[in-house]
């Protein structure tokens, strides 16, 4: 009899220990978001709406994709994200009826979401966490850790971050010793081909270009300025990277711009279409963007 009681007690203790170590949504979480507001969750978020493509990519990267019940219109990566309910574009009036119907326990917003939108969602009684855009790859890792904490995926995030850090280190090892840099014009938008938009100081694109071994000819101008055709001609970049290729801009079309036929990049065949999402979305695919830019600018270092 004593032996039966002993084994029953031991089994019960083991079961309790096992239950205690398993992921669970229980346990209050209190964090301060980037608007300085205390955000309280009853447990890890299980029904999440992402209001930005970068956040959607982070959620899936840390293993929380199955907890995403809504995404804004342009969240198209990873492909599985397209199976999540589309709540519409965030630059328009929010479809609050649809958002409420999804019964989210957490809505993640970023700098692409207007403060008025955050307030609108809060006024509906929804929990809204606001995240500033990171300014470095290292800060992006912090966003991954934050999202993992909110969703209960710390272990998966740690593994993903370690892999990303190793890839960045591999690029840094090859690029940092270089004493020279190739000049680059990165085109963001040529809706007005006479004054195309580019990325300047303080942008992810400039940060990644420089870390990949390039020099951005617009790095002394803040934000996303327009540059005249003459300004680009005067700078004569060694490379022109077409972040607007998906909108129909081609190496052939830019060669038709007045004066551009004599640019070094055009004459040397160094006008390259590029997937802008890899460098404009502050999420884990920034590392993909860094690798692709480094291979583009310094292919001889990445031949293996």
What are these regions, as identified by a protein language model?
Residues 73-77, 195-224:
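Alpha-helical, coiled-coil/dimerization segments enriched in small aliphatic residues
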Residues 116, 132-146, 179-204, 248-249:
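Extracytoplasmic ligand-binding site segments that recognize negatively charged/polar headgroups
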Residues 47-102, 106-111:
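A short, structured surface patch at a secondary-structure boundary
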Residues 139, 145-149, 158, 239-304:
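Structured C-terminal subdomain patch of bacterial secreted/periplasmic proteins
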Residues 34-36, 87-96, 112, 134, ...:
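Short helix-initiation/N-cap motifs at beta->coil->alpha
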Residues 2-6, 10, 17-56, 150, ...:
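Bacterial Sec-exported substrate-binding components of ABC uptake systems
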Residues 95-112, 126, 228-245:
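Proline-aspartate-enriched helix->loop->beta-strand connector
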Residues 52, 111-112, 133, 188, ...:
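Short secondary-structure boundary segments
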